[in-house]
């Protein structure tokens, strides 16, 4: 029996705030749309610039942004835009690495309000949810029932269901679970003309009949899909790469397999027993279509049981080629994941405080590792799988379990691994995965003009061809006098390779184009795909003709025209005219001028400008606290607004200093809208993958702002709160009575800009420091103590919440710790 669940992040009154600037583009368009929808319509300058970027290397200012409340809002916007010939772009979490969600269009932000989990059917193992629900939130609701949505993209806690469908997302465990397309059962969609319909399974005869019987857009779609399958099925089957991971172009090969009753299981172990010839699921055609065919507003997806346990083997190698040679034989052991990390990342990780201890577990001389993970029904089975793998690939290494008979000769492939480690408990497995996942943060923390940007980072190659492909790829990099790291999903042949390039120069852009052209030639030569999981977008659309040939390229365009006759849906992507080297965030015309001389020291960051440009837009700051590293970003969690995220603030600051915004970062509106609500907690400095320190940047900018504009009474009050608190404690309890006087709330709002509903901190007559001295200091002497602690009470602990300090002292002394309080605090 189906059970209904609801999850929504609709904002409450506490977060009701005007998050837009005063300048609005195209007010007549805004007026028309506001009359049609219940959701927000935002065409102001700030909002448009916030949505000009995603997690990719690209930037383009949209026409405006609509935050729809429901499917009817989406339909109204798309119908209106179709009538007015205005492009439309659906967007989720903005975590795209190829620029899929960057375009000159009206952006539909489905992640703002359309976040409900509509229904979970535990017996059928399906869930129905709106397109804007975060995958992490969906899986949190499924976990009590032992189920999950299986595809696990790296930013699954921040990315959303609609984005996973639009991108045909997958993740590190695609060897086990495949791509999103396998799990789509049904989708509610809005077509280019605003028609709301449902796509799901349909037999080919019905497809033809509906195409012939109608004269509307939906009939045109059905008829064209049937015609393409009748005409081009053989060519599609022969031309598409034979890979587990291919998301380039449109998902026509999935439909051909379904039509022929040959849809494969997600782990590629055979034909799906439910695959019957003669029918297709039209919803699965939308997987990987990047919003160019229709907008998905709701979807029913199938689910998988959460594995009982997992075990990890970490194999070490002298070089990355040796690791690549070992991938194909490792796959014979049916792992759930095979991940690679090369010497570039291992060397960088050794120099970091966060990852040095993990890399230190590796034997000396290790220049590459493969992390191999197995799912198992119990710990014993997991240990057995690791033992069998190690017996086959590193027979001299010890294992916790005895290998099975014959395991040592399972593959008879040449052995290249030189060592092996294993992990079965959750803490050690997490350490190994932490080392693997350290790669991207380290690469993206570079503050120089040269960046490891994503544009050919997503190629997919058959495992048996990986050694030759990596060797040839390295030759291309050597010819262009640059380097890259080889890491990520070796099992399905998807290596995330990001060459170091400087696109701020014409020579750098030429290098980018030349490398992309040469690498895509290699991809075709080795039977691969230009995109294994990150999609086409702006980065790779231009290479689809090379990959598929002229005939299928024209088939793509025929399909696009059937769904979107005026080419208004995310135009330019998949089979359009987007170029890898156009609309780059940093290009030869880009200039950044801070407009002042910084006071703080930024020498280790390539100057203040280097830090301003550091955010690459991954969206790691967008999400619940448990998904962002622990602290980052409290204002985003309170407001669920892009402008209150670290990414939003960093992007706005860069755009203000580069001229994309008319405002300077010292203008009143910029300070109020972008910087004011940053609490300066430095959570971003700790948790951001790139190490963006918005608190330090805010301090620099606030100092310059006060130099130019002076300081208000409110600013002076907060800046000198320690002095104020000292007087407050001396005058307590009289100082606490002031806020109880009639009209005090109105006065504090008018004079200090503090909301009248906000109660002010109460002061204690006896401060924490006075209490500690009055009790005679520490009750545990230094001589008798096991340890010592120096306790630094801040202003609030000392004057407003001394009970917190007292409790800390009591706990420490209960543990036989000698406590000291510094003098003059």
Q: Over which residues does each language-model region extend?
A:
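Generic hydrophobic alpha-helical scaffold/packing signal
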Residues: 253, 327, 390, 470, ...
């Amino acid at each position: 029996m189906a059970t209904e669940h609801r999850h929504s992040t609709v904002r409450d009154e506490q977060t009701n705030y005007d998050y837009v600037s005063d300048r609005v583009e195209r007010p007549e368009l805004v007026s028309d749309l506001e009359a049609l929808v219940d959701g927000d319509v935002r065409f102001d300058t700030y909002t448009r610039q916030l949505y000009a970027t995603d997690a990719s290397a690209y930037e383009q200012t949209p026409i405006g942004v609509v935050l729809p409340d429901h499917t009817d809002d989406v339909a109204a916007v798309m119908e209106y835009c179709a009538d007015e010939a205005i492009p439309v772009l659906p967007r989720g979490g903005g975590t795209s690495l190829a620029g899929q969600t960057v375009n000159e269009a009206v952006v539909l932000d489905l992640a703002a309000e359309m976040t409900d989990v509509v229904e979970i059917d535990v017996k059928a193992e399906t869930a129905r949810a709106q397109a804007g629900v975060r995958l992490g939130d969906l899986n949190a609701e499924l976990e009590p029932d032992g189920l999950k949505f299986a595809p696990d993209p790296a930013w699954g806690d921040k990315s959303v269901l609609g984005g996973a469908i639009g991108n045909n997302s997958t993740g590190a465990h695609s060897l086990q679970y495949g791509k999103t397309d396998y799990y789509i059962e049904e989708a509610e969609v809005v077509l280019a003309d605003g028609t709301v319909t449902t796509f799901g399974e349909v037999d080919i005869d019905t497809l033809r009949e509906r195409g012939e019987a109608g004269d509307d857009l939906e009939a045109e779609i059905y008829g064209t899909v049937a015609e393409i399958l009748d005409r081009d099925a053989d060519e599609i089957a022969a031309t598409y790469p034979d890979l587990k991971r291919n998301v380039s172009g449109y998902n026509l090969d999935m439909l051909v397999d379904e039509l022929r009753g040959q849809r494969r299981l997600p782990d590629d172990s055979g034909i799906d027993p439910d695959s019957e010839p003669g029918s297709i699921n039209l919803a699965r055609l939308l997987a990987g279509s990047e919003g160019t065919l229709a907008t998905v507003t709701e979807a029913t997806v199938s689910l998988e049981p959460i594995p009982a346990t997992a075990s990890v083997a970490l194999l070490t190698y002298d070089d990355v080629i040796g690791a690549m040679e070992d991938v194909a034989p490792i796959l014979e052991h049916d792992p759930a994941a095979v991940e690679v990390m090369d010497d570039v990342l291992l060397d960088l990780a050794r120099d970091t405080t966060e990852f040095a201890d993990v890399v230190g577990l590796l034997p000396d001389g290790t220049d590459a590792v493969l992390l191999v993970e197995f799912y198992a029904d119990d710990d014993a089975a997991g240990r057995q799988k690791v033992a069998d793998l190690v017996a086959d690939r590193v027979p001299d290494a010890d294992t916790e379990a005895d290998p099975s008979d014959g395991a040592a000769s399972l593959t008879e492939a040449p052995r290249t691994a030189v060592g092996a480690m294993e992990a079965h408990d959750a803490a050690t497995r997490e350490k190994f995965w932490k080392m693997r996942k350290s790669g991207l943060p380290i690469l993206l923390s570079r503050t120089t003009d040269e960046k490891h940007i994503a544009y050919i980072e997503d190629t997919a190659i058959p495992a048996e061809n990986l050694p030759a492909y990596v060797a040839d790829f390295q030759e291309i990099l050597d010819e262009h006098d640059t380097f890259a790291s080889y890491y990520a999903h070796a099992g399905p042949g998807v290596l995330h390779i990001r060459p170091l390039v400087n696109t701020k120069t014409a020579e750098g852009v030429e290098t980018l184009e030349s490398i992309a052209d040469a690498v895509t030639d290699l991809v075709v030569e080795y039977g691969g795909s230009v995109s294994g999981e990150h999609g086409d977008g702006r980065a790779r659309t231009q290479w689809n003709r090379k990959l598929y040939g002229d005939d299928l390229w024209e088939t793509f365009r025929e399909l696009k025209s059937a769904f979107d006759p005026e080419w208004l849906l995310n135009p330019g992507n998949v089979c359009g005219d987007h170029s890898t080297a156009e609309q780059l965030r940093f290009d030869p015309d880009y200039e950044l001028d801070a407009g002042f001389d910084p006071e703080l020291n930024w020498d280790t960051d390539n100057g203040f400008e280097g830090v301003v440009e550091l955010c690459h837009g991954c969206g790691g700051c967008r999400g619940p606290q448990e998904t962002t590293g622990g602290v980052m970003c409290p204002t985003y969690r309170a407001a669920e607004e892009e402008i209150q995220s670290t990414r939003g603030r960093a992007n706005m600051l860069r755009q203000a200093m580069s001229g994309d915004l008319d405002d300077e970062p010292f203008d009143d509106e910029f300070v109020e809208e972008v910087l004011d609500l940053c609490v300066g907690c430095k959570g971003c400095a700790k948790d951001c993958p790139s190490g963006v320190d918005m608190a330090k940047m805010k301090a620099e900018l606030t100092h310059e702002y006060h130099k130019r504009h002076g300081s208000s009474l409110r600013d002076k009050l907060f800046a000198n709160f320690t002095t104020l608190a000292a007087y407050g404690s001396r005058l307590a309890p009289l100082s606490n009575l002031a806020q109880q006087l009639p009209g005090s709330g109105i006065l504090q709002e008018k004079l200090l800009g503090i909301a009248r509903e906000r109660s002010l901190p109460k002061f204690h007559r006896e401060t924490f420091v006075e209490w500690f001295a009055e009790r005679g200091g520490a009750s545990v002497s230094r001589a008798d103590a096991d340890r010592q602690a120096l306790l630094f009470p801040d202003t609030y602990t000392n004057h407003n919440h001394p009970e917190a300090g007292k409790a800390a002292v009591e706990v420490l002394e209960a543990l036989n710790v000698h406590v000291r309080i510094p003098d003059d605090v």
